[in-house]
Design a protein with these regions (language model features):
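Internal hydrophobic alpha-helix adjacent to the cofactor/substrate pocket in enzyme cavities
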Residues: 6, 17-41, 70, 128
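Short beta-turn/strand-loop junction motif enriched in small, turn-promoting residues
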Residues: 11, 35-36, 41-42, 78-81
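Flexible, glycine-rich terminal cap/loop adjacent to redox cofactors
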Residues: 44, 49-157
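Conserved phosphate-binding and hydrolysis motifs of nucleotide-dependent enzymes
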Residues: 7-8, 107
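Anionic group-transfer/hydrolysis microenvironments
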Residues: 10, 23-24, 97, 101
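An anion/pyrophosphate-binding glycine-rich loop and adjacent beta-alpha core
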Residues: 11-13, 17
Length: 157
């Protein structure tokens, strides 16, 4: 099945980066091997640029349960993150939804400083099937918002 529309006219999420990926899909279909499709683009992150930004990727807790996953949830107040303190932006919350049986990250919701950057790391983790323990135990630079992942994923229960 060929993709016949790109961008906003194609329906679905109306983000610039979706239009960019649509063009990659069409190029793959017209000039390549056709291997790039909407089905293999992976989890789609998005951010709403509030103060602090709100970013999301993957499933919500309710969606995960509805799909039959037994879930574990982790929550971390943004005020617990050293970089948030440095930035004086301690309002917010980080939340992750994990499959209780496989340890796979199913979704994340970040309402915190620099969430628009951090969400992309979690998108890659979802797409690559990286278990939450890898994110929990990784070494991150300090002070950065990404080091919040150590504490967030330690809170999985």
């Amino acid at each position: 099945v060929y993709k016949r529309q790109m961008g906003d006219v194609a329906g679905g999420l109306q983000f610039t980066y979706i239009s960019l990926d649509d063009s990659r899909i069409v190029k793959s279909q017209l000039l390549g091997d056709g291997s790039r499709t909407t089905e293999n683009r992976g989890a789609i992150p998005y951010s709403v640029f509030l103060d602090p930004p709100l970013s999301r990727v993957g499933l919500t807790e309710a969606e995960a349960v509805k799909k039959g996953h037994a879930v574990k949830v982790a929550r971390l107040p943004a005020a617990a993150v050293p970089k948030a303190k440095v930035l004086r932006q301690t309002n917010g919350l980080l939340k992750a939804i994990v499959d209780a049986e496989t340890g796979q990250l199913l979704g994340a919701h970040l309402f915190c400083a620099e969430s628009q950057e951090l969400i992309n790391l979690l998108k890659l983790a979802i797409d690559a099937g990286i278990p939450y323990t890898e994110l929990r135990d990784a070494v991150y630079t300090h002070p950065t918002m990404s080091e919040a992942l150590n504490d967030l994923f330690t809170a999985v229960n």
